[in-house]
Amino acid sequence: MLILSPVDRADEAPALIDAGAEELYAGYVPPYWKEAFGPVVSCNRRSFDEANAGSFGELEELVRAASLRDVPVHVALNAAPIPGGMIPRLVETASDLARIGVRGVIVSDLSLLLALREAKFRRFALVAGTLFSAFNGMAVAFLRRAGAERVVLAREMSAEEIGAVVRTAGGTRIEAIGFRGRCPNIEGFCTHLHDDPGRTWPCELRYEKSWAGPGEAIPPQVLAAIGRNEGTDRFFSCGLCAIPLLERCGVHALKIVGRGSETARKVDAVRAVAAMREWGRKNIPGAAESAARGKALYLDTFGRPCRPENCYFPEFRPSAGHSWVMPGREG
């Protein structure tokens, strides 16, 4: 299983690769898109400057820096939906990206995916992004027919569900998101913009609340459900416990979230994922062992214990009983 890391600038690439990243992905907003939609609506769901290469030339430098270490770079063009008039222009942009050595694009709009399929760029992967909400093998098969050779699964899935999809994916390579950026909503159905340079998204804010249901007060269980996500810092999201088992079930790449974050944070994330993967390869652990090791590594990485609201794979928490067992192993 490869480690796929975000990258924003050429000078970050060596440190990320040294930490263990084997693939990188970046953001880029073409000038014509900025002219059409202004500074808020991005073609890759990140509008603040830190999350995108500053120019096409800077992106080319980034690709060159990664290629010196034989590490491929993908570029996110994963806005959805995309206005029809922009599809041909983004296909032209993809052609320019292929020319400078970008190895693929991440897309989340079906019309763009189909147009890129028809363009038939050589050695250029079409990656179906997580906004397609691929929760099952039928969704993966549909996206494969639409041109995707890689699919990023919905980030709300359990490790067992991911393993089941991998078994039916055939030649389609599967990516799973598993570190930083856990979404409290079903991401593919969420219309929030991710445009705050401070990286506090609308789903993390505390809102005034009113109640229109039966009774005079908001029921405690409703308040508790809301409180699980309010004020949550997605920087602390983690799925380390599942990494050894995801690798053994055939996930192609573990994707780390974090375009626009500081270089040190990206490097720490890559190191943590690489350390958990290496430990899993040496020990071939069951679920309970993975859970214990993941929690210890989380504490080392963040300096605090893991919490339920930050957990990508809650089935690895003690209350879940580690119900998933890989064939031939006891949890």
Language-model features, listed with the residues they occupy:
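Active-site pocket-lining/capping segments in soluble small-molecule metabolic enzymes
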Residues: M1-F132, V152, S158-G331
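Conserved nucleotide-cofactor-binding alpha/beta core module
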Residues: N136-M138
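As written
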Residues: G147-A148
